[in-house]
Amino acid sequence: GMLRFNTDIGRLEVWRNDHWATILGESPNLGDHNQTNSAGGTGTRGLFAGGYLASPSPLSGNAFNNVDAITVETLGNSMDFNNLTGSFMGGGQCADRTRALYAGGRGPTASSGDNANISFCTIASRGDYADSGFDLSTSVSCRGTSNSTRGLFGSFISPYADTIDYVTIQSLGNAQDFGNLTEVRGYGMAVSSPVRAVWAGGINNPTNLGTNVIDYVTLSTTGNAQDFGDLVSNSGTGAYESGNVNSSTRGVIAGGTRFSKIIDFFTIATTGNSQRFGDLDVLTKSGKGSVCSTTRGVIAGGIGDPTPATVNNMEYITIPTTGDAIDFGDLQSFARRLPQAGCSNGHGGL
């Protein structure tokens, strides 16, 4: 049948007698057979970027520039992959099938000033991130999400803001104003399908308490977010700096808040409150990083119990099902850390 390019979702479609059917793109399967860790497998490459070390490390309070890599389909420890342009914590990441972006953050210490820069790397190679020469609209920490063409950054802190910025991943440029979240909040989580981006939870301003709000935007347009529903399982304290993974249809929010193992999920294309998915294996607080394929989500790091120790464990879930998380492996051994920024070349938004 006839072909067309659907600019709303950034995909090619074919006419099937009575409807347009999407032609699915494929992410390149990456891996390094010389490795004996997770990255030795072939499949979706996930990147955990930056973070900072907490007690009892003698370097506690310092951010770092290391980026870890895993193959999402292969259990095992991460490998040292490449480096950010500086030592940052709290930045946001997003990616299409070939390029990863890192934006914002704070460094080189946890008390340093904020960074507005947008940097990028080629996911298939181990070359370091490069400075794009372009910036976010403000220099703050944030969370990122994307479809195959457009990256969004929001849930800013320092100060808390309702701003949403966007960039075109392959052409870059300074971030443009997309719209606003339904409330001012920072430390929220973001997931996406090819059509929608959804923000969930965070810390509200001016109360400085966790919020359970979920709101969404349509990625191909610009405009303010609309109410989606609420995070139900963490309704008492909200959720912030949690793990966030997604398939093309389902978003999953894992842990975070004030020491919680709770995992919630929601269907991205609809609206409504979240439902209980299961529990994480390790009890942690906030500061989690996460990466995913269309079927598996990997959640890593965080603040351990007792605080302020950080943990280097990774655990995984199967996104289309429900159930408890299972041990995946560890972030590289020297890095007991809070990654916060994760992305992959095969997530459900592509």
Report each predicted region and the residues it spans.
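Polar, enzyme-active/binding microenvironments
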Residues: 2-350
